[in-house]
A protein has these predicted regions:
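Amphipathic, Lys/Arg-enriched alpha-helical "gate/interface" segment within cytosolic domains
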Residues: 1-101
Length: 101
């Protein structure tokens, strides 16, 4: 697991920016702790706000159909309507989306 809390997300993001100069990141959902996907923990909001604050576009790829919570479904839908954070089914769609924002 690469991202388990706000600090690990921030460390990851800053390292990618420093080493590559890139401000668009794609990450498989398996690299993110399961707590992220339970909105009651507020971890997702805190982590994603860091990406927005640092002006880094971020896509999480994977199958999100197992999350039955209406609030999680609404959260994913709302993110996908924006221009900073995306939850997409695969890397190809993520590259396509991040190249247009």
């Amino acid at each position: 697991m690469l991202i388990s809390d706000v600090q690990s997300a921030l460390d990851f993001m800053v390292t990618v920016q420093y080493k590559t100069g890139c401000n668009r990141i794609i990450l498989n959902k398996s690299a993110i702790g399961e707590e992220f996907f339970h909105l009651s923990t507020k971890i997702a909001g805190e982590i994603l706000q860091k990406f927005v604050n640092y002006r880094v576009k971020f896509a999480v790829v994977g199958d999100f159909s197992s999350y039955a919570s209406e609030s999680m479904k609404a959260f994913i839908l709302e993110c996908n309507r924006g221009k900073d954070i995306f939850f997409l089914p695969d890397e190809e769609k993520a590259v396509e989306k991040l190249s247009t924002v």
